[in-house]
Regions:
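Cysteine endopeptidase catalytic domains of the caspase/legumain-like
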Residues: 1-202
């Protein structure tokens, strides 16, 4: 909820993203439809943020909804299916942020050393594919740092915050933790996610 609030407005109160919230309880089919709707247009930027449970089975990584059955082939939404939707999208800048266990699996191919990202795609995840996402104070540690970055911790001298600067902020903040964020991107330049008042006047 806090992530949505931060992305809705810039630091000066001007509107930013048109946010659609999908809060618990949500069914797998509803979330999948929401993801498809998010990336079906041709806008400048579309951003998917998911915070919840992640699971890996023999077929790869999944994000998990409350109605999912453990060990079912269709447990949750496959990360590879999310990538198919994102890679086919005509949106210019496509951003996926996942705060769940095993999130680093998204974007991987059968060849573990390679990721399959079409032009304009950026992915930021809370942890590697073989790691669990830590919680602190009832919230994901990654999401807490994401919010800190969006509030201004990841801003440049002009007050602009990009997905690249958010990753750098979170990675540095997690330096003493075993959890490592993963960043994958295929862009020529980063778009600004949010603008805040610069801490230093220039």
């Amino acid at each position: 909820e806090e992530v949505a609030g931060l992305l809705q407005k810039h630091g000066n109160g001007n509107p930013d993203f048109d946010v659609r919230r999908m809060l618990d309880p949500q069914k797998r089919a509803e979330v999948l439809t929401g993801i498809q709707d998010l990336f079906k247009g041709d806008e400048e930027v579309a951003l998917l943020y998911f915070s919840g449970h992640g699971y890996i089975n023999a077929y790869g990584g999944n994000i998990v909804m409350p109605d999912c059955v453990e060990d079912d082939y269709h447990m949750g939404i496959a990360m590879k299916d999310i990538m198919t939707i994102v890679n086919k999208s005509k949106v210019k800048n496509k951003i996926v942020i996942l705060d769940c266990c095993h999130a680093g699996n998204i974007g991987d191919t059968e060849h573990e050393d390679y990721a399959q990202l079409k032009s304009g795609v950026s992915i930021l995840t809370a942890c590697r594919k073989d790691e669990y996402a830590l919680e602190m104070g009832g919230h994901g540690l990654f999401t807490e740092l994401l919010c800190e970055g969006l509030r201004g911790g990841a801003a440049d001298f002009n007050g602009n915050i990009s997905i690249g600067s958010v990753y750098a902020y979170i990675d540095k903040s997690l330096d003493c933790w075993t959890q490592r964020p993963i960043f994958k991107t295929n862009v020529s330049e980063f778009v600004s996610l949010r603008n805040v008042i610069p801490k230093v006047s220039i």
